[in-house]
């Protein structure tokens, strides 16, 4: 029996925000923590990465920003605020407030043992398992989450919009697997 209380481990949080103004590509290119190349994506974006960031922030000339690679919502939002601060301090954008929004939380769960996905996939409504195409079983969650379940007992949860939704989805996944005979 799989323990439904097994906590998921967050591996990536994607969040976005908008500066609600255009960003100066020339000034952004001069920033030491920014990677900007006009040849990449037609010069429409640059990347801000500082030593304190777990991931990086993509900054579009339109002012939209995407934070990827953080392992918590707080860190992801912090990356967006830090990127905004660097843009303002270097004159690439005017001072403004941002309102970060979580778009996706990706986490892993380890069941601690093998899961017989070949046997239980037929007992799980909506499960997709085709070992010739992909070695894992794909499931849709109750909320916006999707699951990948591998025979090794490793699982991936993607699509959560909050830590609470992630915990509910993890509990739901493990309960459904138990009910199917895992």
UniProtKB/Swiss-Prot annotation:
Signal peptide: none annotated. One of its GO terms (molecular function) is DNA binding. Keywords: DNA-binding, Repeat, Transcription, Transcription regulation. It holds the Pfam family TBP. GO terms for biological process: DNA-templated transcription initiation. General factor that plays a role in the activation of archaeal genes transcribed by RNA polymerase. Binds specifically to the TATA box promoter element which lies close to the position of transcription initiation. This is TATA-box-binding protein. It comes from Cenarchaeum symbiosum (strain A).
